[in-house]
Amino acid sequence: MVIYLDVLIFENSIVNTFLLYITAQTLRIKVKMRYLILAGIFGGLYVIVLVIPTLKIFSSLIFKIIAAFLMIIICFRKKSLRFNIKALAVLIMYSMVTAGLCFFIELNNTRGSYFNAFIGNVSYKWILIAIMIIYMFVNRIIWFINDRKLTQSLIYEIEICFKDNSKFINAFLDTGNELREPITNLPVIVVEKDMVSGIKWDDCPKFYVPFRLFNGKAGNLEAFKPSYVKIYIGDKVEVRNAIIALIDNKLSSLNDYNALLSRGSI
């Protein structure tokens, strides 16, 4: 029997990527595709130990579990041992279900059977791999469309008003953002610095707003208080007092918005 190692690695990489993908969906964890694919390729390369006799020692159950655990680490990049063990259990469960499905198909894939007549000369493995690829591709498209709809529904046009002029900016309502300036207790609107580069705000009251990110990083944002801020919500216009904090980074990779509204702004 001739075994093409490159084809075997490719097939197993796709299957492992799919299993990790549905594991992430089950755990409701967002993962970056590059880490997902990298973990799938790592799992695909592990098949080498099954076909090379000198590496047979690494094909035992304990090494298979270690390889699966490393796939979890590469894919999810979580430090929590409890989460990684939970993810490993889900991955093993889906692997067993997939193996059982393949065994069932192979058992019923006999000459003259209805299943054999249905797929003809096409290998059932390639049909399953095609289904896995289509599922991941379509699911990502649906997720992207829904995410875009949600993002657009939370974008509002705001007008930052000064004594002599004003600036219109698209702002995203960050429902998890409760940032307030500690002295005035006013809500903070984070704005890209470039968006107010042409505005003379030197005469406005200056502040430094402390912040802390989820990764533990802390610091202070340079901020000022405009005359007022208008928030356009459908046909209504809300006038608010707020602090404008400036940030150097881009807030949207697609440039959908250039500011973040705190929950207390609306």
Curated annotation (Swiss-Prot):
Compartments in which it is found: Cell membrane
UniProt-listed Enzyme Commission number(s): 3.4.23.-
Topological category with respect to the lipid bilayer: Multi-pass membrane protein
Superkingdom, natural source: Bacteria
Any one of the GO CC terms: plasma membrane
GO MF assignments: aspartic-type endopeptidase activity
Pfam name, any one: Peptidase_U4
Active site: 174
EC primary class: hydrolase
Keyword vocabulary terms for this entry: Aspartyl protease, Cell membrane, Hydrolase, Membrane, Protease, Sporulation, Transmembrane, Transmembrane helix
GO biological process: asexual sporulation; proteolysis; sporulation resulting in formation of a cellular spore
Segments crossing the lipid bilayer: 36-52, 60-76, 89-105, 126-142
Family, per entry: Belongs to the peptidase U4 family.
Role this protein plays: Probable aspartic protease that is responsible for the proteolytic cleavage of the RNA polymerase sigma E factor (SigE/spoIIGB) to yield the active peptide in the mother cell during sporulation. Responds to a signal from the forespore that is triggered by the extracellular signal protein SpoIIR.
Protein name (Swiss-Prot/TrEMBL): Probable sporulation sigma-E factor-processing peptidase
Protein source organism: Clostridium acetobutylicum (strain ATCC 824 / DSM 792 / JCM 1419 / IAM 19013 / LMG 5710 / NBRC 13948 / NRRL B-527 / VKM B-1787 / 2291 / W)
Gene: spoIIGA
